[in-house]
């Protein structure tokens, strides 16, 4: 009948249109030529032949400090002018190689060098600029991040108001110490680690937080960050046993949290051993990312002994711990 015929013709038109969109590179090229703004990943732009004949007036690359040199060059060669946006004091490029293959270690180390950092350190004058106002964090948290990681510049905190949470029991920055708790040491699991005492302390804090928020009928986003996959799995398992109506919780590793933000961040250190071995937690950039995700409240859970002597040249937890005990107005050590 006429109705079926109409729907069939409509279907044929849509099918032809879809085929043109998915298969006709010339059709894609015409659309792209008329576009003022195109979004892509660094490597994704090389996946389409239509970009081979296009030169952009501007190429803006976000999170440029995390990209390897080859990844950055893919979009950079397609632009007349380049803007790189990033933070070389946060996570570096990540390259996956077989750690046991000695022949690849030199290549791996080379690829993990940040072109963004190299350019930042070598370029002078008006060719680079530093953003000096942060709009994410409460001023107490922002001041700490500025002092610990960006002391060479004065970063202004925005006037945006951030409310206080659990202000009688906690400060905007709190460290819950597990050193005096039984069984506070880490447990190895394959190549990863977990810490049951830190998981217990985290659940206790979430209970307190949810109870406090329920009194005011307010919901908050919570990010729980761990440097180790075994701890992430443990935390995920423990959190799933509870139902907190006023908490929207995300649990992930440090790498997954870069670029994200939550009202409250809980950072689970995990490492706690007699040798005071920090593993890759000794990388200050990873700690910077973890601590700077918080908007209103930052809670660190772990053994304060990590802030003492370690067999490494650098221990980023030492100056963090010293800042906390030196600023009782904004910070609190809970033992």
Predicted regions and their residues:
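Conserved helicase NTPase catalytic core signature
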Residues: 1-58
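Conserved helicase motor core of SF1/SF2 NTP-dependent helicases
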Residues: 43-335
